[in-house]
């Protein structure tokens, strides 16, 4: 094996077809065979990063250890490969053009006419090749759909890389939809044929096809697609109820073996130990609970995809299936919506819309002693609710929502004030991994099993230290601080007053893994399960174990 091998994942017919999960699953399979894999996503949009994009359009923003605001697929990569990626794992058209224009303005092109080819494509190729020195394979997912005008420079850059490294060192996998028409009663292969034709017109002949469908594709149709697209390796990836089955599906169809042979990789036998326990927990769960995600963007579950997966992982060890109940913070019937839930999670967000609903929901959870985890904005709203209804600071709020509030219990971070004045919103928050010191004997410390931790952050507002003492005097516990900046990172209630009530300024969902569930989510699931078992015991439905 000579040099780094490249695998490119493209998509056809429709977007959101599963390219990211295909890339993550293939990366997991190669990793389980002992290969060192680096994986990245190319996003064709002109935004520099997704940090300022509407979550209802784009989905969640996933934060890396080094503080990059990235596409949600990077979260899938980290969870499936059990790795921590950095900012080089997500490349956007905005980043590429910004860099090229900066180079042009500083005279680095020595008077050349700056063009898409070669200058833009050269910068894309440079970013594709960025990876640790000991990597065997770079998997690159090209976002969007072939034929999109925005994707063309990325497709061309990938074609050039194949030419430069040699066909034997490069593998193109095209993920395409094979739709089933109910009216005709049959699956249609033409969309995939046309998609591959567009790819071939761009100079790329795919080496393998991953055909997405809700129903199995007949052998005849698979052979037809193979013939018409001139591709021998055809995999039918039928929709599965659990995304962690996808590596098994691809392996059963031999995709990883094909890639290894095509690229002449020195790979060992596959080690399924990473997934065996996870799949066993999913398929053989012993109990079920319902946890409400109370948020501003519940219309698009992808806006909270890492929270969803962290909650699911939180139940794997105890073989507890976590069912999600979506509760919109603008819902007028919050009391009824939260009536029979076993636990609640209030994730992050921005802006004033839905805030009063969040505060109302948090009060319900606190007073009903529902196990509750607040994340980022969720923690801030927990503080606001407590200040209003326990401490008596009527009208308490955050300066994010109300500039002239009498009780700004949540306020703009000092270093963020000038940034906001200058309207510099992109990439300027407190981003990345920061240290927190937890109070000995606190719920937080007991969950983490240590008092010295690091978590990923994405915020520009903080709990106001000026009101901390009044909150503490009335029972709110400040259980974790960043000692370098004296920032409040964790709050909670005493376990004598509430079975599980904790908030963090961080985004712990970004560090959860299927085999290593995050302690906060694991704790929430355990508390929710205990609440359910106690309720069933009291109603005579079951006997406590």
From Swiss-Prot:
Residue sites binding Mg(2+) per the record = 73, 141
Output the Gene Ontology terms for molecular function.
ATP binding; CTP synthase activity; glutaminase activity; identical protein binding; metal ion binding
Record-annotated residues binding CTP? 15, 148-150, 188-193, 224
Task: Give the record's keywords alphabetically.
Answer: ATP-binding, Glutamine amidotransferase, Ligase, Magnesium, Metal-binding, Nucleotide-binding, Pyrimidine biosynthesis
Positions contributing to UTP binding = 15, 188-193, 224
Biological process, per Gene Ontology: 'de novo' CTP biosynthetic process; pyrimidine nucleobase biosynthetic process
Mind telling me which NCBIfam families this protein's record contains? PRK05380.1, PyrG
Give the multimer and partner information. Homotetramer.
Q: What is this protein called?
A: CTP synthase
Organism for this UniProt entry: Tropheryma whipplei (strain TW08/27) (Whipple's bacillus)
Q: Which gene does this sequence derive from? A: pyrG
């Amino acid at each position: 094996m000579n040099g780094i091998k490249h695998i490119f994942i493209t998509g056809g017919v429709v977007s959101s077809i599963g390219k990211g999960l295909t890339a993550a699953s293939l990366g997991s399979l190669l990793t389980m065979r002992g290969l060192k894999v680096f994986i990245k996503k190319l996003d064709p949009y002109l935004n520099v990063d997704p940090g300022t994009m509407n979550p209802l359009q784009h989905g969640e923003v996933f934060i890396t250890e080094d503080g990059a605001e990235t596409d949600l697929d990077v979260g899938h990569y980290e969870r499936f490969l059990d790795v921590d990626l950095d900012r080089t794992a997500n490349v956007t058209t905005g980043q590429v053009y910004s860099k090229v224009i900066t180079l042009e303005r500083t005279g680095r092109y020595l008077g050349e006419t700056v063009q898409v080819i070669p200058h833009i494509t050269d910068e894309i190729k440079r970013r594709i090749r960025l990876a640790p020195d000991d990597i065997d394979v770079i998997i690159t997912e090209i976002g969007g759909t072939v034929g999109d005008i925005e994707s063309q420079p990325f497709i061309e850059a990938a074609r050039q890389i194949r030419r430069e490294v040699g066909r034997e060192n490069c593998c193109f996998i095209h993920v395409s939809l094979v739709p089933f028409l109910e009216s005709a009663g049959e699956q249609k292969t033409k969309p995939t044929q046309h998609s591959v034709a567009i790819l071939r017109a761009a100079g790329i002949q795919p080496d393998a096809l991953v055909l997405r469908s809700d129903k199995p594709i007949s052998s005849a149709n698979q052979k037809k697609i193979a013939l018409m697209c001139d591709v021998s390796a055809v995999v039918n990836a039928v929709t599965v109820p659990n995304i962690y089955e996808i590596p098994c599906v691809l392996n059963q169809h031999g995709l990883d073996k094909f890639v290894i042979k095509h690229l002449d990789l020195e790979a060992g036998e596959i080690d399924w130990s990473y997934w065996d326990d996870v799949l066993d927990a999913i398929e053989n769960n012993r109990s079920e609970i319902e946890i409400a995600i109370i948020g501003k963007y519940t219309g698009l579950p992808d806006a909270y995809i890492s929270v969803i997966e962290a909650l699911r992982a939180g139940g794997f060890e105890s073989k507890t299936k976590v069912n999600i109940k979506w509760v919109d913070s603008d819902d007028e019937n919050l009391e009824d919506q939260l009536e029979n839930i076993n636990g609640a999670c209030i994730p992050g967000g921005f802006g004033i819309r839905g805030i009063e609903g969040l505060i109302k929901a948090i009060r319900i959870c606190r007073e009903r002693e529902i196990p509750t985890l607040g994340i980022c904005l969720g923690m801030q709203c927990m503080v606001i609710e407590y200040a209003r209804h326990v401490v008596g600071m009527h009208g308490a709020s955050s300066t994010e929502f109300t500039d002239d509030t009498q009780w700004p219990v949540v306020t703009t971070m000092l270093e963020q004030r000038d940034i906001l004045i200058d309207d510099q919103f992109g990439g300027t928050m407190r981003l990345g991994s920061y240290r927190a010191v937890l109070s000995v004997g606190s719920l937080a410390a007991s969950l983490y099993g240590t008092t010295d931790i690091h978590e990923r952050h994405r915020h520009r507002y903080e709990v106001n230290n000026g009101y901390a003492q009044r909150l503490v005097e009335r029972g709110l516990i400040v259980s974790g601080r960043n000692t370098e900046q004296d920032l409040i990172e964790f709050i909670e209630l005493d376990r004598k007053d509430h079975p599980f009530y904790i908030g963090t300024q961080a985004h712990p969902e970004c560090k959860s893994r299927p085999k290593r569930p995050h302690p906060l989510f694991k704790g929430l699931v355990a508390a929710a399960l205990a609440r359910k078992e106690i309720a069933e015991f009291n109603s005579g439905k079951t006997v406590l174990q």
